[in-house]
Amino acid sequence: MTDDQDCAAELEKVDSSSEDGVDAKPDRSSIISSILLKKKRNASAGPVRTGRDRVPTYLYRMDFQKMGKCIIINNKNFDKATGMDVRNGTDKDAGALFKCFQNLGFEVTVHNDCSCAKMQDLLRKASEEDHSNSACFACVLLSHGEEDLIYGKDGVTPIKDLTAHFRGDRCKTLLEKPKLFFIQACRGTELDDGIQADSGPINDIDANPRNKIPVEADFLFAYSTVPGYYSWRNPGKGSWFVQALCSILNEHGKDLEIMQILTRVNDRVARHFESQSDDPRFNEKKQIPCMVSMLTKELYFSR
């Protein structure tokens, strides 16, 4: 199932299990058992403060005919040869993201259980479309992963090979427009134990602003976790990162700047989620998302 509205209803079907999982290749030397999600309920609800004035020179233009496309790649089932487990709970993520980005004005499509070649083909074709009337582009990758790699149903592919289709020299109609990638996947096998809380200017050479734009400019990568670490997912509620991302976007997606949004996502994941397990190696573990921005202006989804 891809493109039609019926995918939202289908994706609402979630697994009844309450065990958390991680989006990484299984560790066959040990079994993670009885991992339960413990979500703290003391989220604050203070007034919204943007903390800055919107200066047009430093804002991405959003006055286009369309917000743009959002492609969600939702990989749940994997070929046996990959050694990857079923990602129970990912349909919950995909359904929530579908509604969230649709509410922001995106044209959203969902593609399930894609092979590596299919992922490449989807994004290559998307990059070849005419985005002249669109303000931006978004892509969400939901799958197993390793550092710099993402799993298709039949194997693994470098994330950079997927995103490179949208470089400024390859996708001209998205030049100087934001290209957003949200990635829910493990980036290693380290576990975060958590901890109890108790230079001069550089002389640059000025260039003609109409001369050239770096081909890697205007990208944003929002990862569910930092390099080297596991990323947690609950089969009944979805991944910690996507739960937080959708919650903040639904609350403040049209009034906060994207970096403010993602900073709040970081805070919510860091403070409100924690694993619990009978195995002390996996008990009370934490997670912190990570953003890498090459954006050159501020981005507000309001139009």
From Swiss-Prot:
Positions marked as site (Involved in allosteric regulation): R187, Y223
Record text on activity regulation: During activation, the N-terminal disordered prodomain is removed by cleavage. Concomitantly, double cleavage gives rise to a large Caspase-7 subunit p20 and a small Caspase-7 subunit p11. The two large and two small subunits then assemble to form the active CASP7 complex. Can be cleaved and activated by different caspases, depending on the context. Cleaved and activated by initiator caspases (CASP8 and/or CASP9), leading to execution phase of apoptosis. Cleavage and maturation by GZMB regulates granzyme-mediated programmed cell death. Cleavage and maturation by CASP1 regulates pyroptosis.
Tree of life domain: Eukaryota
Region (Loop L1): 76-87
UniProt PTM: Cleavage by different proteases, such as granzyme B (GZMB), caspase-1 (CASP1), caspase-8 (CASP8) or caspase-9 (CASP9) generate the two active subunits. Its involvement in different programmed cell death processes is probably specified by the protease that activates CASP7. Cleaved and activated by initiator caspases (CASP8 and/or CASP9), leading to execution phase of apoptosis. Cleavage and maturation by GZMB regulates granzyme-mediated programmed cell death. Cleaved and activated by CASP1 in response to bacterial infection. Propeptide domains can also be cleaved efficiently by CASP3. Phosphorylation at Ser-30 and Ser-239 by PAK2 inhibits its activity. Phosphorylation at Ser-30 prevents cleavage and activation by initiator caspase CASP9, while phosphorylation at Ser-239 prevents thiol protease activity by preventing substrate-binding.
Location of region: Exosite: 38-41
GO aspect biological process, one term: defense response to bacterium
Bias (Basic and acidic residues): 10-26
Residues forming the catalytic site: H144, C186
Region Disordered, residue ranges: 1-26
Catalysed reactions, as listed in the record: Strict requirement for an Asp residue at position P1 and has a preferred cleavage sequence of Asp-Glu-Val-Asp-|-
GO cellular component, one term: extracellular space
Keyword field contains Ribonucleoprotein: no
Deleted gene: phenotype: No visible phenotype; on the 129/Svj background, mice are healthy. Mice display impaired lipopolysaccharide (LPS)-induced lymphocyte apoptosis and are markedly protected from LPS-induced lethality. Mice lacking Casp3 and Casp7 on the C57BL/6J background die immediately after birth because of defective heart development.
Modified residues (Phosphothreonine): T173
Chain spans, region Loop L3: 226-238
Segments for region (Loop L4): 274-288
Modified residues (Phosphoserine): S30, S239
Keywords recorded for this protein, A-Z: Acetylation, Allosteric enzyme, Apoptosis, Cytoplasm, Hydrolase, Nucleus, Phosphoprotein, Protease, RNA-binding, Secreted, Thiol protease, Ubl conjugation, Zymogen
Region span, Loop L2: 187-196
Site (described: Cleavage): L36, L37, A45, G46, P47, V48
Subcellular location field: Cytoplasm, Cytosol; Nucleus; Secreted, Extracellular space
Protein family per UniProt: Belongs to the peptidase C14A family.
Domain comment as written in the entry: The exosite polybasic region mediates non-specific RNA-binding, acting as a bridge for RNA-binding target proteins, such as PARP1. The exosite is also required for interaction with non-RNA-binding proteins, such as Hsp90 co-chaperone PTGES3.
Protein function: Thiol protease involved in different programmed cell death processes, such as apoptosis, pyroptosis or granzyme-mediated programmed cell death, by proteolytically cleaving target proteins. Has a marked preference for Asp-Glu-Val-Asp (DEVD) consensus sequences, with some plasticity for alternate non-canonical sequences. Its involvement in the different programmed cell death processes is probably determined by upstream proteases that activate CASP7.
Protein name per the record: Caspase-7
Organism: Mus musculus (Mouse)
Gene (UniProt): Casp7
